Curated annotation (Swiss-Prot):
It comes from Escherichia coli (strain K12). GO terms for cellular component: cytosol. Its cofactor is pyridoxal 5'-phosphate. This is L-seryl-tRNA(Sec) selenium transferase. It catalyses: L-seryl-tRNA(Sec) + selenophosphate + H(+) = L-selenocysteinyl-tRNA(Sec) + phosphate. Belongs to the SelA family.
Length: 463
């Protein structure tokens, strides 16, 4: 060991001496004596490793208390941190999809603080059914005979197939064999449910006769899968649910549909592209329709199945239903969200998802212009801060080819170096409330479609 190395080792403080320092008293009160000591031992090991490797002391050795505080503060942060979503994707899967309405937040808080009538019937003091209240709401909204709720739409599809078609064939168009995030593929789900997939048609064209020829004595279902996360365009042919239901009645085979994102209102009335609605498919005679709670519906993560009473009864009695059932917080949030749909005139104001999707480009443009000046003053030495038009997307596999005109604040480095954009984006991710944008075409873009709290936004970026 060299003299220089020995000198560096000698500069490392003893743990008991550090703990006697007044700056560590509050740290021990906040994080506990044991955790502070554990971290100091870890940091001493790190410092010795740096000395061995580079013959220097880590920079943080100048202020041990400050480094311990920084590390423990970061460690204590929740894994689910609030962020400001300026990615341009409204229903961002990685950021939790739909924001909940205030009514849903209040309902969840109440369900967490107090015992609730989850499976208790107040009329006869007997055991109730956890889906009953929501089933009544869903039937009122969609016109279905009954409903079933599980923890997400993937679970809904799995339960729907396992309870009604296990050991039998399910006929699906080849152009509808979708894969969603996480490599969740319809063929794989069918295998897991114990079904045999019977593909018909081609990728771009499937006719009624393709389904007819596929039906045999082992056919359990005719299935439609809404291709919500991609679009096949050009020379195409697909039959709709009404035509498939007519064929199913002729052949005595029920029709089920995985609708995916599942909007409960006609989005075209808000100037958005129209998505098929569960109530339309129920009216067409589809036996079961599944859809998500946390996409266009704007509620919590949930899988919702509506349809014919006898079919829903098979789902409710299947062993998988208990494994996949939703908890009381999910049910509370979903009920509160569904009740908003009973008053459609106020929906775009009270439902955050719809409110954000329907913000006009003009309003967002004015907001961007208002925020440009303070940000340009703060970042102008390194970046050109501009207001630019952009296109938002709905996200979570909803309306994949449709974009929403929006406006963004863009940051372009004066020296043109992309590394400066990466550094800026990284700095913003380290803020107490991280600001998440996207880097594209030599700029860092902050799409303001989802920005409602301007004060918090400026507090973060002007730090």
């Amino acid at each position: 060991m060299t003299t220089e190395t020995r000198s560096l080792y000698s500069q490392l403080p003893a743990i008991d001496r550090l703990l006697r320092d007044s700056s560590f008293l509050s740290l021990r009160d906040t994080y506990g004596h044991t955790r502070v000591v554990e971290l100091l031992r870890q940091m001493l090991d790190e410092a010795r490793e740096v000395i061995r490797g580079s013959q220097t002391l880590p920079a943080w050795c100048e202020n041990w208390a400050q480094e311990v505080d920084a590390r423990l503060t970061k460690e204590a942060q929740s894994a689910l941190r609030p962020v400001i979503n300026l990615t341009g994707t409204v229903l961002h899967t990685n950021l939790g999809r739909a924001l909940q309405a205030e009514a849903a937040v209040e309902a969840v808080a109440q369900a967490m603080r107090s015992p609730v009538t989850l499976e208790y019937d107040l009329d006869d003091a007997g055991r109730g059914h956890r889906d009953r209240a929501l089933a009544q709401l869903l039937c009122r909204i969609t016109g279905a005979e009954d409903a079933c709720i599980v923890n997400n739409n993937a679970a809904a599809v799995l339960l729907m197939l396992a309870a009604t078609a296990s050991g039998k064939e399910v006929v699906v168009s080849r152009g509808e064999l979708v894969e969603i995030g996480g490599a969740f593929r319809i063929p794989d789900v069918m295998r897991q449910a114990g079904c045999t997939l019977h593909e018909v048609g081609t990728t771009n064209r499937t006719h009624a006769n393709d389904y007819r020829q596929a039906v045999n004595e082992n056919t359990a279902l005719l299935m439609k899968v809404h291709t919500s996360n991609y679009s096949i365009q050009g020379f195409t042919k697909a039959i709709d649910e009404a035509e498939l239901v007519a064929l199913g009645k002729e052949l005595d085979v029920p029709v089920v549909t995985d609708l995916g994102s599942g909007s409960l209102v006609d989005l075209s009335q808000y100037g958005l592209p129209k998505e098929p609605m569960p109530q339309e498919l129920i009216a067409a005679g589809v036996s079961l329709v599944s859809f998500s709670g946390d996409k266009l519906l704007g509620g919590p993560q949930a899988g919702i199945i509506v349809g014919k009473k006898e079919m829903i009864a098979r789902l409710q009695s299947h062993p998988l239903k208990r494994a996949l059932r939703a908890d009381k917080m999910t049910l509370a949030a979903l009920e509160a969200t569904l009740r908003l749909y009973l008053h459609p005139e106020a929906l775009s104001e009270k439902l955050p998802t719809l409110r954000l999707l329907t913000r006009s480009a003009e309003v967002i443009q004015i907001q961007a212009q208002r925020l440009q000046a303070p940000l340009a003053a703060h970042y102008g030495a390194e970046f050109a801060v501009q207001v630019m038009p952009c296109l938002s997307q709905i996200g979570s596999g909803s309306l994949p080819v449709d974009r929403l005109p929006s406006a963004a604040l863009t940051f372009t480095p004066h020296d043109g170096r992309g590394s400066h954009l990466e550094s800026l984006a990284a700095r913003w991710r380290e803020l107490p409330v991280p600001v998440i944008g996207r880097i594209y075409d030599g700029r860092l873009w902050l799409d303001l479609r989802c920005l409602e709290d301007e004060q918090r936004f400026l507090e973060m970026l002007l730090k």
